[in-house]
Amino acid sequence: MPTFVDQTKIEVQAGKGGDGMVAFRHEKYVPNGGPAGGDGGRGGSIIFVADSGLRTLMDFRYRRKFKADSGENGRIKSQYGRAAKDLYLKVPVGTTVYDFNTGELIGDLVEKGQELVVAKGGRGGRGNIHFATSVNTAPEIAENGEPGEDRVLRLELKLLADVGLVGFPSVGKSTLLSVTTKAKPKIAAYEFTTLTPNLGMVILPDGRDFSMADLPGLIEGASQGVGLGIQFLRHVERTKVILHLVSMDPNNGREAIEDYHTIKNELKNYETDLSKKRELIVASQMDISGAEEKLAAFKKALKEEGNNEPVYEISSVTHKGVSKLMNDTATLVEEVEKERAEEEPKVVQKTKEYKYKAPQKNEFTVEKVGEHEFVVKGEQLERLVQMTNLDHQDGIMRLARRLKRLGVDDALREKGAVNGDDVAIGKFVFEFVQ
C-alpha cells in the first residue's frame, strides 16, 4: 500500500516567453528591406488536474520542483516562435492549493478533470516588426520574452468522502468500513491501528451509494494536534454526514457519555466548527458481554441532557443493525445534498486560472547601498528590464527613456545619485547619467 501523504510543499516555475527577433528583409529586388523579426512563443504554464485515480500526494514527496519549457524565439521573415507545451500535474480530487509564503488560497480541486493554472507562462517578446516608425524605419529593437510565474505552493489533501467515521481509537470504525465496503483497512485490538484514512464505497441493494472514510481515532486534544490530531481532522471538513461511533465495550475503562462529549468537543474546537455537521450516533461493539448495560446508561445520560437523537446499535462482527444504519445514512446524505443544492447551486469551473495580486503600477524603491551604489527594486521595473534586449543599442536607449518617464531618474537624484554612480535593477547594472 502506498504511503499516505496529505500535505506537501512544492515549487513551480512556468516557462519564459521566447525572445523577439531582430531581423530584416533580404530579398533580391528589395535592397533596403524593412524589419522582419517575429515574436517569441508563449512559455508553458503549469496546470494541476484533479485525478480520481489518485488517493495521496505521494508523487510530490520526492520531487518538489517543477519547471515548464520556455517558448521558442521569434524567427526571420516575421515568423512567430512556437509556444511551449503546458506542463500538467495530476493531483487527487480534494486537493487544496495555497501560496506557501502568504497562506492565500489559490484554488480547490473538487471535481474529476477540473484544472487549475497555478503558474502562467510568460508571453513572447515582440520582434522588431512592432517597433518601426516613420522616423526609425529599421529598428534594432526587440523584446526578450516575459519570465514565467515562479511560486512556492502548499498542497493539502482533504478526502472527498460523503460520510466520515469518527470516534476514539479501537471503537470499530475500520471493522465497520471493511464489512460495508471493499476497503481493506488494517484491523487489530490496539489503539491507533488506523494511521491513515481509508476510503470505501457503500453500495446498497436499492442502488443507492455513498463514499465513506474511516479516519484515524481521535483523542482529547486532537484539535490542538494531540495524538494523530489535527492532521486528520481536515478530512472531516468535506464530509456531508458523520457517523459518531461510541464503544459499548465495558472493559475499556471509559464512560460512553464522556467519550461522546470528548469527540464532540474536538470537532467543535477545530478551526471550522465540525460539530455542526449532521451526525448519526452509533453504539458499536454490541456483541461484547455487558454492552447492553453500558448502552442503557449511555442512552439515559443523553436523554437527561435533552439529546433525543436515535442511537444505532450495531455489531460489525455479527452485522447486527448494520443494514439499517447504512440505509439511514444514505437517506441523510441525500437530505444534506438537497439542502446544499437549495442553498447554493453547484457550479464548478472546468479550468480556472489563479490571478496573483499584481503590484501597484510603477511602484518601486531606491536604496543607497554604498558610497556610489544604488539599488532600485520594483517587480514591474525588474520585469521591464528582463524583457529588454540589451544586446542592441536601440533597446538600451528605449529602456533609458522608459525609466525616465517612470520617475526612476528623479528618484535616484533625490537619493543623492550623481554622474558615474552604479545603479542596479535586478541583474542589470548601469552607470547613472544626469
From Swiss-Prot:
Localisation: Cytoplasm
Domain OBG-type G: 161-334
OCT domain sequence ranges: 356-434
Top-rank taxon: Bacteria
Top-tier EC class: hydrolase
Binding-site list for GTP: 167-174, 192-196, 214-217, 284-287, 315-317
Gene Ontology cellular-component annotations: cytoplasm
Family per similarity comment: Belongs to the TRAFAC class OBG-HflX-like GTPase superfamily. OBG GTPase family.
Protein name: GTPase Obg
Gene behind the chain: obg
